[in-house]
C-alpha cells in the first residue's frame, strides 16, 4: 500500500491518488469534549509540507464517501484503504470512550451512509497512545447492537502509532476487545525531517511472520528518499506512508522489486497476513 500522508483537504484526495497512492492518511482533530471536528494536523509536521490544511469533518467525510462509492461520479477505484490518524491527545482521557462512540456514528452515518453499498474503503483507526485504547473499545461496542456490525467485522482495522512497546500493544489490543491478527496494523516511524533506523520495523515484521504473532500488516512512515524506500521494501513492509507517492510507485517498477511487490487493489484483503 502506498499511503499518502496528511491528506486533509478534499482536493488532496485526487492529488495523492493521481501521484500513485492507493491509500490515504487523514488527520482527525477533536473538540475539547472529544467530538470529531476537523481534518487537521497542525505544527510541527513534515519537512516541505503545509501543516495547517483543514476541512470541516462532515465535508471531508462526505467527499471521502463519494470517492469510495462505486457508481458515484467521483469514485476512485484506486482508493482502497484509509488510515484515520486520530488526534486524541487534545481532550480529557475521561472522554475517550464517548469520543470513540461519536466517531463510530460518524463512520456509520456519514461515511457508510447507513448502507452496505457506500464508502467501501477499508479503514484503519490509528491511535497515538496505548492508553487511549478505550476509543477502539467504544467504536467496536457501538456496533454490537447495530445492523452494520458486518461492516465493522469486514472493513475496520486498528493501529497504535506512538512507537510504544509491542508486547504491551498486544495486551492493550486485547483490553480493547481486539484479538491477535484481528485486523491489526503496526506502524513505525517518525517525521521525514529525521532519519530513523529500521530496527523496530524489522521487529514488527518478525512478529507478523511468527506463528504466534498478533500483527497482520506492518507499515513505515514518513519517507520518500529513494534509499529509505528501498531499505523499507527490503525489510518486507506491507505499506509505506509518504508525501511523494510517485517515488514509491517508481521504485516498485525497478528490477529489484517489480517481481516481489505489486500495488494492492481492492481484492487484496488488508487484514490477511501475506505469505511468500
From Swiss-Prot:
It is found in: Secreted. One of its GO terms (biological process) is killing of cells of another organism. GO terms for molecular function: lyase activity; metal ion binding; phosphoric diester hydrolase activity; toxin activity. InterPro entries: PLC-like_Pdiesterase_TIM-brl (IPR017946). Disulfide bonds join 45-51, 47-193. It catalyses: an N-(acyl)-sphingosylphosphocholine = an N-(acyl)-sphingosyl-1,3-cyclic phosphate + choline; an N-(acyl)-sphingosylphosphoethanolamine = an N-(acyl)-sphingosyl-1,3-cyclic phosphate + ethanolamine; a 1-acyl-sn-glycero-3-phosphocholine = a 1-acyl-sn-glycero-2,3-cyclic phosphate + choline; a 1-acyl-sn-glycero-3-phosphoethanolamine = a 1-acyl-sn-glycero-2,3-cyclic phosphate + ethanolamine. Its EC number is 4.6.1.-. GO terms for cellular component: extracellular region. It comes from the Eukaryota. Its cofactor is Mg(2+). The active site is at 5, 41 (nucleophile). Mg(2+) binds at residues 25, 27, 85. Its main location: secreted. Binds 1 Mg(2+) ion per subunit. Keywords: Cytolysis, Dermonecrotic toxin, Disulfide bond, Hemolysis, Lipid degradation, Lipid metabolism, Lyase, Magnesium, Metal-binding, Secreted, Toxin. Expressed by the venom gland. Belongs to the arthropod phospholipase D family. Class II subfamily. Dermonecrotic toxins cleave the phosphodiester linkage between the phosphate and headgroup of certain phospholipids (sphingolipid and lysolipid substrates), forming an alcohol (often choline) and a cyclic phosphate. This toxin acts on sphingomyelin (SM). It may also act on ceramide phosphoethanolamine (CPE), lysophosphatidylcholine (LPC) and lysophosphatidylethanolamine (LPE), but not on lysophosphatidylserine (LPS), and lysophosphatidylglycerol (LPG). It acts by transphosphatidylation, releasing exclusively cyclic phosphate products as second products. This is Dermonecrotic toxin LlSicTox-alphaIV2iii. It comes from Loxosceles laeta.
Amino acid at each position: 500500500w502506498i499511503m499518502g500522508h496528511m491528506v486533509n483537504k478534499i482536493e488532496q484526495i485526487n492529488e495523492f491518488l493521481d501521484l500513485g497512492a492507493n491509500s490515504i492518511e487523514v488527520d482527525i482533530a477533536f473538540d475539547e469534549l472529544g467530538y470529531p471536528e476537523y481534518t487537521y494536523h497542525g505544527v510541527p509536521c513534515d519537512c516541505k509540507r503545509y501543516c495547517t490544511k483543514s476541512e470541516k469533518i462532515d465535508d471531508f467525510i462526505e467527499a471521502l464517501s463519494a470517492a469510495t462509492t462505486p457508481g458515484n461520479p467521483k469514485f476512485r477505484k484506486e482508493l482502497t484503504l484509509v488510515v484515520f490518524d486520530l488526534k486524541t491527545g487534545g481532550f480529557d482521557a475521561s472522554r475517550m470512550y464517548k469520543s470513540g462512540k461519536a466517531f463510530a456514528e460518524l463512520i456509520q452515518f456519514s461515511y457508510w451512509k447507513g448502507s452496505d453499498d457506500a464508502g467501501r474503503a477499508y479503514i484503519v483507526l490509528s491511535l497515538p497512545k496505548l492508553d487511549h485504547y478505550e476509543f477502539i473499545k467504544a467504536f467496536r461496542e457501538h456496533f454490537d447492537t447495530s445492523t452494520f456490525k458486518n461492516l465493522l467485522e469486514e472493513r475496520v482495522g486498528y493501529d497504535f502509532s506512538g512507537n510504544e512497546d509491542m508486547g504491551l500493544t498486544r495486551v492493550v489490543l486485547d483490553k480493547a476487545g481486539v484479538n491477535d491478527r484481528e485486523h491489526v496494523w503496526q506502524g513505525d516511524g517518525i517525521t521525514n525531517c529525521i532519519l530513523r533506523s529500521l530496527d523496530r520495523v524489522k521487529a514488527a515484521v518478525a512478529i507478523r511472520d511468527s506463528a504466534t504473532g498478533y500483527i497482520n500488516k506492518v507499515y513505515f512512515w514518513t519517507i520518500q528518499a529513494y534509499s529509505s524506500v528501498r531499505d523499507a521494501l527490503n525489510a518486507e513492509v506491507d505499506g509505506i506512508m509518504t508525501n511523494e507517492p510517485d517515488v514509491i510507485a517508481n521504485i516498485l517498477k525497478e528490477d529489484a522489486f517489480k517481481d516481489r511487490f505489486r500495488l494492492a487493489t481492492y481484492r487484496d484483503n488488508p487484514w490477511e497476513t501475506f505469505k511468500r
